[in-house]
Regions:
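Terminal targeting/pro-maturation regions of precursor/exported proteins
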Residues: 2-79, 111-113, 389, 394-398, ...
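Cleft-lining beta-strand/loop regions that shape enzyme active-site pockets
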Residues: 22-38, 44-54, 58-59, 114-118, ...
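Extended, small/polar residue-biased N-terminal targeting/export presequences
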Residues: 53-116, 160-179, 186-192, 400, ...
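Short clusters of hydrophobic/aromatic residues that line enzyme substrate/ligand-binding pockets
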Residues: 80, 258-259, 271, 317, ...
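A polyampholytic, Gly/Pro-enriched intrinsically disordered region
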Residues: 278-286, 331-340
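Conserved functional hotspot residues or short segments at active or partner-binding sites
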Residues: 333, 340-416
Length: 416
């Protein structure tokens, strides 16, 4: 058997194995949807390359490229991981692994990682990265061919050496080069305070494990001081622990569905509010924006769909899936999304169509460009975007108005 034949057999078998795994997980390998026909086209293309390409192709590069393209075109939150990537993925922790302190996504239509949110006090926030920034390259290496695990991997190493990022910001024609230290990010604290009219304000920057217990303690203290209403600020709250999201929503619900999880081959798992975990029945308004993603979206949807309170702001990002790591014989692995989170009303938080993803607020309040803090315009670090002054914060002001006078909800919807 010549080397080209060996190459063809290896590549076909590798892709078939991966295709079978992904198809089996997602329930997509069937004659009805034309999957096998697409495989035959792939094999025809492979045959043409084998017979007509000017040089003998690199087996490793071809196999890796074919598998990577297959996985990431099917699943933007998945990826083909090398053995080195697998070790990093299993040990990764946002607050224990060196990095830049940013929550990232890789929208399939964009092809590059984008910043959803930055952790207050983290190196990305201090360096001026903002939600919506596109990371075009890291240390001169393009990120277009990287999955998110690989992006975080290169952002964590080498430790102590700043990462040189080429960033594309909105409304700017040319990329900016930003140097960001690689360092351990500290978990941000919950912020609570008493606003006017006895309204408790609770800001949750990140839903890490244990944060719900912290919210319970601090909010309970405000309730005992006379708070009669609650503003739960989940703007720029991305990522986090899904279990914490369920627990946080349960603080405001004594019954009903909080969310459910389901996939093609993943049995439906429903999360229901427990009356014993209820903290308060006080009126609540939840603040959200385009950087509200993941666990925070579960909370907002639970409050909204159970008619427990108003959700104020703009449509959220739309991220809510569960990944499974599938080991392969050579130490590499597939990271595949196997289930998605659904709202109590049955809507996918992370829809196939990005336009349908996310949670729409009951009261939409858009922020004007002038109300968005730009690091170049003022000596204000990006974390200040989370909490503009009360005079500037139209979303917070409207939430307060609604809590003080619920009759203003309909007027607000018309105005928005």
């Amino acid at each position: 058997m010549n080397s080209k034949s060996k190459y063809a057999i290896l590549l076909i078998s590798s892709v078939l194995v991966v295709y079978a795994i992904i198809g089996g997980m997602l329930g997509r390998v069937s004659a009805q949807n034309g999957s096998y026909q697409q495989l035959s086209i792939f094999m025809e293309v492979l045959s043409r390359i084998q017979n007509d390409y000017v040089d003998e192709p690199s087996v490793k590069n071809a196999v890796d490229g074919a598998i990577r393209g297959l996985v990431e075109n099917v699943d933007p939150y998945g990826g083909y991981l090398t053995a080195k990537d697998v070790v990093f993925y299993k040990n990764y922790d946002l607050f224990k692994t060196p990095g830049i302190g940013a929550i990232l996504a890789k929208p399939p239509r964009l092809g590059y990682p984008v910043v959803i949110s930055t952790i207050p006090g983290g190196s990305a926030a201090k360096a001026g990265l903002s939600p919506g920034d596109i990371i075009e390259s890291i240390d001169g290496v393009t990120t277009r061919e990287m999955n998110l695990v690989q992006v975080h991997g290169i952002l964590s190493n080498p430790v102590g050496k700043p990462a040189a990022l080429s960033i594309i910001k909105s409304r700017r024609a040319e990329p900016d080069t930003i140097t960001v230290p690689r360092e351990i990010t500290q978990p941000p604290a919950i912020d609570t305070k008493m606003l006017e009219n006895n309204i408790a304000y609770v800001k949750v920057p990140y839903l890490a494990a244990g944060k719900t217990a912290e919210v319970r303690r601090q909010l309970d203290a405000l309730l005992k001081k006379g708070a009669t209403d609650v503003v739960l600020d989940l703007r720029y709250t991305a990522g986090g622990d899904d279990k914490e999201a369920v627990q946080l929503a349960n603080l405001f619900l004594d019954s009903g569905t909080i969310a459910y999880l389901q996939g093609q081959k993943f049995p439906k798992e429903t999360f229901t509010a427990n009356a014993t975990d209820l903290l308060t029945k006080a009126p609540v308004a939840v603040l959200v924006n385009q950087a509200t993603a993941g666990a925070a979206e579960i909370v907002a949807a639970a409050i909204e769909d159970n008619h427990r309170g108003q959700v104020v702001g703009v449509k959220t990002f739309g991220s809510g899936s569960v990944q499974k790591l599938i080991s392969l014989d050579d130490g590499s692995a597939l990271l595949v999304s196997v289930a998605k989170y659904f709202t109590p009303s049955g809507k996918e938080i992370q829809d196939v169509d990005p336009q349908d993803s996310g949670i729409k607020p009951t009261v939409e309040i858009r922020q004007t460009m002038e109300e968005t803090v730009e690091p170049d315009d003022q000596d204000v670090l990006p974390p200040a975007k989370d909490q503009p002054t009360k005079e500037e914060d139209r979303q917070l002001n409207r939430a307060i108005e609604i809590l003080k006078d619920p009759s203003k909800i309909s007027a607000t919807k018309k105005a928005a």
